[in-house]
């Protein structure tokens, strides 16, 4: 049996439910699949099945995460749902499943809670482009004014973290009522689910395709081919490369070298173009083997620059996850794995009032590398010490 081909007739978006524990994230995910299953656009996935999220490893960190697929009339969605709070933090920081849009679930019975805030902060730090609010469990609150109050609080919270809290869409309903509803898509219990899906289709922006972004390829290996020159190999992270394109070699120093890719090859075949996701070899004009090394990147001129100092949101592994057993302070110098670069860096600053960072913490810090690497906001990295992963981070701002 051949694998079913993924039909690209509709734009594809990655979305996810976020919010406080027991506010109904997983029930809402189940309700979406139930409603769409009436139209043959999803397989109904009940709560128990989503909740048994399989383990995945991303940058040496184990995360429990469920991937649910469904489509509306106009779009195809991959929806992620995590069973535990720590899984959400780890997922958002490692980028195991990046989100083009998030559905913030808030229970009308509770209003915004500590994890609601933490997820909103993380969504801001990792640049989730858009957010829709689903106020859940409205059937358990008799007074409409109390729900209005919850909506006001959520909008204020979103404003505080620089989301358009006054303008973004808010849908009210009961995910459980929909999950327990009859087999009739026109039953009123499904109205909020339909409203949510219509809102996702209209409000979540279509993501830019990886091939439309400026070319970037981390250098994995360098070979010298007698009579032909220097070939660098790697997996194209984004964009397109064609023979004759000019590229910059960036990283390891502030000195940026320009060269031209004279040939693009994959499995010893010459390509007209290499695309995001392809593992290729690029032949570089006029570059010696010792002028380029693993850890650098090839990139479209002017699209990325080398830096040493940046701010990052970091998740520090617990000892049960294979991380450190003890806290660390400013001045700690682990290895940073940034794309293919492996570089020593120092933690030079923590937030005010933070003296030390404990295993299991999620904290913003400033990092200074011993030499410059191609860095940009939103980029993910791993922190390792003595051959084991001790943390994962995402760049939130470039300092210098």
Swiss-Prot record:
Catalytic reactions on record: GTP + H2O = GDP + phosphate + H(+)
Compartmental location: Cytoplasm
Lineage: superkingdom: Bacteria
Binding positions (Mg(2+)): 26
GO MF annotations in UniProt: GTP binding; GTPase activity; translation elongation factor activity
Name listed for the protein in its UniProt record: Elongation factor Tu
Function description: GTP hydrolase that promotes the GTP-dependent binding of aminoacyl-tRNA to the A-site of ribosomes during protein biosynthesis.
CDD domains noted in UniProt: EF_Tu, EFTU_II, EFTU_III
Subunit (UniProt): Monomer.
Region (G3): 81-84
Annotated segments matching region G5: 174-176
Gene behind the chain: tuf
Region (G4): 136-139
Region of interest: G2: 60-64
Predominant location: cytoplasm
Entry EC no(s): 3.6.5.3
């Amino acid at each position: 049996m051949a694998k079913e081909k993924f039909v690209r007739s509709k734009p594809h978006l990655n979305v996810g439910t976020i919010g406080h524990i027991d506010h109904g994230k997983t029930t809402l995910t189940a309700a979406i699949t139930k409603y769409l299953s009436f139209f043959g656009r999803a397989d109904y996935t009940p709560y128990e099945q989503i909740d048994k999220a399989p383990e995945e490893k991303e940058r040496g960190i184990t995360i429990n995460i469920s991937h649910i697929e469904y489509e509306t009339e106009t779009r195809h969605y991959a929806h992620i749902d995590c069973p535990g709070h720590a899984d959400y933090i780890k997922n958002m920081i490692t980028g195991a499943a990046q989100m083009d849009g998030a559905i913030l679930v808030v229970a009308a019975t509770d209003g915004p809670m500590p994890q609601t805030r933490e997820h909103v902060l993380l969504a801001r730090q990792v640049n989730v482009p858009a957010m829709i609010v689903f106020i859940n469990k409205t059937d358990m609150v008799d007074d409409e004014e109390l729900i209005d109050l919850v909506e006001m609080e959520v909008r204020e919270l979103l404003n505080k973290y620089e989301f358009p809290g006054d303008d973004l869409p808010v849908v009210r309903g009961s995910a459980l009522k929909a999950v327990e509803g009859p087999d009739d898509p026109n039953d009123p219990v499904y109205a909020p689910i339909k409203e949510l899906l219509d809102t996702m289709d209209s409000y979540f922006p279509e993501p830019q395709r990886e091939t439309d972004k400026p070319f970037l390829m981390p250098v994995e290996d360098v070979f010298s081919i007698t009579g032909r020159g220097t070939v660098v190999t790697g997996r194209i992270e984004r964009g397109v490369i064609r023979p004759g394109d000019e590229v910059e070699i960036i990283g390891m120093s502030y000195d940026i070298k320009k060269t031209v890719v004279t040939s693009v090859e994959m499995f010893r075949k010459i390509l007209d173009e290499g695309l995001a996701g392809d593992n290729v070899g690029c032949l570089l004009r006029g570059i010696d083997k010792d002028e380029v090394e693993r850890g650098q990147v090839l990139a479209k001129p002017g699209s990325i620059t080398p830096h040493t100092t940046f701010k990052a949101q970091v998740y520090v592994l617990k000892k049960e996850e294979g991380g450190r057993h003890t806290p660390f302070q400013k001045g700690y110098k682990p290895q940073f794995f940034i794309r293919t670069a492996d570089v020593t860096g120092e933690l030079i600053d923590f937030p005010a009032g933070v003296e030390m960072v404990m295993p299991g913490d999620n904290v913003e810090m400033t990092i200074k590398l011993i030499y410059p690497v191609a860095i940009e906001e939103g980029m993910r990295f791993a922190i390792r010490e003595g051959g084991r992963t001790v943390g994962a981070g995402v760049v939130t701002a470039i300092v210098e």
